[in-house]
């Protein structure tokens, strides 16, 4: 494993980015709709680069740190872009609706979905 992508750099995603950067040799790519948060992530060296259409297919693990519907929307919109055999992990606090929507999507593509939880 070499590259980690993080979608959403708020409290959960930002904390994960900083911890991964501090304790691993992995390259961390991140994306955040709030421009100030994105700028801070770069300034704090929580990410190495922006998660884009070019960098997403390079990621071995992608952590999705959004609200439940945002997780579903992002993963379904980018389902064909994830690297084959990569792990796509949601970090939302609700499981049933997310897992019901995304396990079938992951089965159509060559990546693996994990319904995670930031507190468990």
Locations of regions flagged by a protein language model:
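Rossmann-like NAD(P)-binding element
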Residues: 54-82, 86-89
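NAD(P)+-binding Rossmann beta1-loop-alpha1 motif at the extreme N-terminus of oxidoreductases
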Residues: 1-53
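A general structural motif
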Residues: 1, 25, 59, 84-86, ...
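Short amphipathic alpha-helical segments
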Residues: 17-18, 42-43, 74-77, 100-103
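Rossmann-like NAD(P)(H) cofactor-binding subdomain of soluble oxidoreductases
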Residues: 77-120
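Structural motif
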Residues: 7, 31, 65, 89-92, ...
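Structured loop/turn residues at beta-strand edges in well-structured enzyme cores
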Residues: 45, 57, 108-111
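Conserved short alpha-helix immediately C-terminal to the canonical SAM/SAH-binding motif I
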Residues: 37, 70, 95-98
């Amino acid at each position: 494993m070499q590259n980690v992508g993080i979608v959403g750099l708020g409290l959960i995603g930002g904390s994960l980015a900083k911890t991964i950067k501090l304790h691993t040799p992995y390259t961390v790519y991140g994306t955040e709709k709030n421009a100030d948060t994105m700028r801070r992530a770069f300034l704090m060296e929580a990410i190495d680069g922006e998660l884009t259409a070019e960098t997403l297919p390079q990621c071995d693990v992608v952590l999705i740190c959004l609200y439940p519907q945002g997780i579903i929307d992002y993963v379904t919109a980018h389902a064909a872009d994830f690297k084959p055999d990569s792990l796509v992990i949601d970090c939302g606090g609700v499981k049933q609706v997310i897992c019901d929507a995304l396990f079938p999507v992951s089965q159509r593509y060559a990546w693996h979905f994990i319904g995670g939880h930031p507190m468990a």
